[in-house]
Each structure stands twice: as structure tokens, then as C-alpha cells.
Amino acid sequence: MSEQTQTCASEIQATNVAVQHPKSEKINLMNLTRKEMRELFAEMGEKPFRADQLMKWIYHFGEDNFDNMSNINKVLREKLKQIAEIKAPEVSVEQRSSDGTIKWAMQVGDQQIETVYIPEDDRATLCVSSQVGCALACKFCSTAQQGFNRNLTVSEIIGQVWRASKIIGNFGITGVRPITNVVMMGMGEPLLNLNNVIPAMEIMLDDFAYGLSKRRVTLSTAGVVPALDIMREKIDVALAISLHAPNDELRDEIMPINKKYNIKMLMDSVHKYLEVSNANHGKVTIEYVLLDHVNDGTEHAHQLAEVLKNTPCKINLIPWNPFPEAPYGKSSNSRVDRFQKTLMEYGFTVIVRKTRGDDIDAACGQLAGDVIDRTKRTMEKRKFGKGIAVQNH
């Protein structure tokens, strides 16, 4: 293992230790992969297939009550009730857009995270968070303004999928498209929480859980290169790179992670990932948020084309979602069109991501941040004897 990879691994481990969530006396079964659940059942003197049955109840049927698991005998159900629980994050606030997008603030301990459901004509995508806040401090990101609090556990990651599935109809309620895709593009940097993100994605892929194709699970990263190299050896899912700048000088300014792992280092790691991945069809997705007169000029498009000339990719151009006190502006339609056309002249596949949820808090992290701020204000008022209740939605 390289010195750089060792450093990254130690950073991840240190972060996990520093922010451990208080443990329940009972085992939360949502923290376990099928292999780990089988090991638990073996310790209980039970056959491995019982673990398979239990996973089906939890993830196929959305069941969190052992008493309702009819093909598991009563003695085993009673054993499970003594030592285990099935616990997912609860929704504290829900916002529904006129275009069908649903955004939830979910409670994890005493903190808030965000999960977003995005229905389309041929699919429904769930955008999942991996951390409470984020340590990377990208200047254009609402979540980054909150700072980093802690990593999410496996159950808090996969539990977002479970909770959303229960709400929008994966478990037999009609009228809403079931979740077909999951993207790790919510709050946080997934590669700084590998210990929990990888098992959560394994559950997403497991046929006894959600059985998603590895092409339908996407991890988006700002470029923690050593962690990407580790992930390459552990799991194969679709990969998206949050690039957002065509040169190191600009990327250093808007994405401080680039000072540690620059564009060349990142793209070298991406090429290694593509060499072994079946999930990506030989192409990586490049994400590029457009900031008015910062990174959206024709010269930037030419520079980006040069950076990506040897990388099989599709490029997603993302209209920036403003948030309070942000230092940037949203690119005009004409600048977006010109940027897209310039890249297409080089032969790239370039898609301008359709803006969703315009009538709700669209910027990632904004809803959770608003809930946290409102709760803090409420607690401060209570502290000084004003006793105002938290606003219900």
C-alpha cells in the first residue's frame, strides 16, 4: 500500500472513531450486509437461509416489525426482539415540488441529513447522503457551509432508501414510480466514509435486498484519490467525478481538495477504475457545475476538452442552485448553451442537467441547514424562556 493510500486510510479511520454515533444496546440489522447477517444467525445457532428471509422482509417488503414476519418461527422472532432492531432515519420535514420531486430532511441522532426523490419518464432516482455536513469546503456548495459533523452509519445510508421506498410506494402502494436508481450525490463526500458507504452499496446491489444493477448505483466524488483506489478493489458501481473546473488554479480556488489531489492525479485514478469496472460501460460521468463568469467561459470549455481528450466520458453540465450568502451567480442560458456547443464540437456527449424542484429548496444541504438553523433558534428562544415550538410541516 502506498504512503498516500495509508494516509488516506488513516484519515478515514480517524474520522470514523472521532464521530462514532452512540450505540444502541440492540443490533440494528440495517447495519449488516447479508454476509454479516448470516454470521449473526450462525452465532444464534440458526441456518443461513433465515438471514436471507429476514433481509427479504426488511428490504423487499419494508417490514420493521418482527411479529409480522410470518415465515420466521415465533421462537426465532422472540430471540430477534431481544437482541436486534430494524431502525431507519425518520422524516422530520418533507417538501414536494410541482414536478414530482420530493425532498426530505431526515433525523439521524440529533442531526439532519437530506434525501431527494427525482421521478423521470423512464426511471426514478434517489439521491442519498453519506455524511452529516461535509469537510471538503467546496465554495459553491450549500452543504459545505455547514462544516463536517460526522459520518453516517450503514443503517443511516441504506435507511434513506428504505424510508423513501416506504413513502413513495416501492412496497405495493400505487401511483408513484418505484426507485430504480440510487446516486450517492447528497450531503457529504462518500469516499471519506468508505467503511459505511461500501456495505450500504452492497446491500443496494444484493438480490435479497434491493437487487439494483451496479449500473444503477452511482457514487459521485470530488476526488479523494487514495480512497477511489481502495474502492476500485472493493466494489464496482457507476462513477461520477465532480470536476467543476478545467485547470488546477481555478479548481484549487473553488475545491480545496484539489490542492491535495490535483486534476492529473484524479484522472489517472479514474482511468485505473475504468480499466476494471463493468458498471460504467467504459465511460465515466464528469459533473461540471456552471458558475457565472467563473468557470463557464468559452476558454474554460476549450481547457476542459483538453483535460478530457483521453478520457471516455459523458459530461453533465449542472446549472448552479443559489443559496443564501453564496459568492457566485447562476450562468445565463446563453453562456450554458455556448459552453455545451463548444464541448460538443470536440465530439463529447454533453447533457445539461434538467433543473428539478425549482419551487422547493433546490441547493443540496439547504433544507437540512434550514431545519438545523430553525431548531437552534427555537432552542435559544426556549433557553431564554420564550418557549416557541418547532414549526411543523
UniProtKB/Swiss-Prot annotation:
One of its GO terms (cellular component) is cytoplasm. Its EC number is 2.1.1.192. Disulfide bonds join 127-364. Its cofactor is [4Fe-4S] cluster. SUPFAM superfamilies: Radical SAM enzymes. It is found in: Cytoplasm. One of its GO terms (molecular function) is tRNA binding. S-adenosyl-L-methionine binds at residues 188-189, 220, 242-244, 321. One of its GO terms (biological process) is tRNA methylation. It catalyses: adenosine(2503) in 23S rRNA + 2 reduced [2Fe-2S]-[ferredoxin] + 2 S-adenosyl-L-methionine = 2-methyladenosine(2503) in 23S rRNA + 5'-deoxyadenosine + L-methionine + 2 oxidized [2Fe-2S]-[ferredoxin] + S-adenosyl-L-homocysteine; adenosine(37) in tRNA + 2 reduced [2Fe-2S]-[ferredoxin] + 2 S-adenosyl-L-methionine = 2-methyladenosine(37) in tRNA + 5'-deoxyadenosine + L-methionine + 2 oxidized [2Fe-2S]-[ferredoxin] + S-adenosyl-L-homocysteine. Keywords: 4Fe-4S, Cytoplasm, Disulfide bond, Iron, Iron-sulfur, Metal-binding, Methyltransferase, rRNA processing, S-adenosyl-L-methionine, Transferase, tRNA processing. CDD domains: Radical_SAM. [4Fe-4S] cluster binds at residues 134, 138, 141. Residues 120-359 form the Radical SAM core domain. The active site is at 114 (proton acceptor), 364 (s-methylcysteine intermediate). InterPro entries: Aldolase_TIM, Methyltransferase_A, RlmN_N, RNA_MTrfase_RlmN, rRNA_lsu_MTrfase_RlmN/Cfr, rSAM. Binds 1 [4Fe-4S] cluster. The cluster is coordinated with 3 cysteines and an exchangeable S-adenosyl-L-methionine. The keyword Cell cycle does not apply. Belongs to the radical SAM superfamily. RlmN family. PANTHER family: 23S RRNA METHYLTRANSFERASE (PTHR30544), RADICAL SAM CORE DOMAIN-CONTAINING PROTEIN (PTHR30544:SF5). Specifically methylates position 2 of adenine 2503 in 23S rRNA and position 2 of adenine 37 in tRNAs. m2A2503 modification seems to play a crucial role in the proofreading step occurring at the peptidyl transferase center and thus would serve to optimize ribosomal fidelity. Reaction proceeds by a ping-pong mechanism involving intermediate methylation of a conserved cysteine residue. This is Dual-specificity RNA methyltransferase RlmN. It comes from Actinobacillus pleuropneumoniae serotype 5b (strain L20).
